[in-house]
Amino acid sequence: MNRREFVATTFGGMASIVAGGSMRAQEKAATSFTLANLPYAFDALEPYIDKMTMEIHHGKHHAAYVNNLNNATKGTETKSLEDILAGVSKLSPVIRNNSGGHWNHTAFWNWMKPKGGGQPVGELATSITRDFGSFDKFKEQFGQAATGRFGSGWAWLIKQHDKLVIASTPNQDNPLMDIADVKGVPVLGLDVWEHAYYLKYQNRRADFVQAWWNVVNWDEVGKRFVNAK
C-alpha cells in the first residue's frame, strides 16, 4: 500500500467512525414519545364510560399531549418521562402540561379494566384500612378529592414512604413533579377533566366518580403499590 492509499484508507475509516457516531447521536436525539394502544376495546368500559368518550379521550386528547411533547422537546437532550417530571420546574409550561398529560393518561388507561371494581386485596388492602380506617372511608375521601377539585385536574392515591395519602392536582400536574404541593408515587389516579366524562354525565361529576369505581383495575393498583419506592 502506497502513502496515498494509506491516507485514504485511514481517514476514510475515521470518517466512517465519526459519521456512525453522528448517526447514533441523531437517532438518540430523535427518540420520541409514543401513544400506546388502549389495553382494551374502546367500548370495553361500557356502560360506565362510553365508547365515544374513550375514542376522543385517547385518540384526540392523549394523542395531542404526545405530539405536543415531542414538538416541545425536539432537539433537546433525551430524557425519560419520569426525569422530565422530576425537573419540570426548570422547563417550559408547554413541556410541563404535556409531559404530565402523557404520563397521567398512560397510567389512567391501565388503572381501569373491563369487569373491574370490587375491592383491593393483600398489602394494598391492609394499608388502605390502616391509613384511612376502612375501604369505604377511603372511597369517600378519594371521592371528595375528585369532586372537590375546582376546574380541571386529577385525584390521586399516592405512596409517601410507607404511607398512603390522597391528593389532587390542577390541570395535568401530578405528584411526581417537583412543583407538586403533595409529592409521592401515584398508585391510582382519576381524571376529572370534563373531557373524561361530559358526553355521558354532562356536569354530574359526582355520578362519573361513583360509576368509575366499577372499572378500577385493583390488580394494577396493587402492583404499583408494591413497586412504589
Regions of interest found by a model, annotated:
Residues K60, V66, N70-K79, L85-A167:
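All-alpha RGS (Regulator of G-protein Signaling) helical domain and cognate RGS-like helical scaffolds
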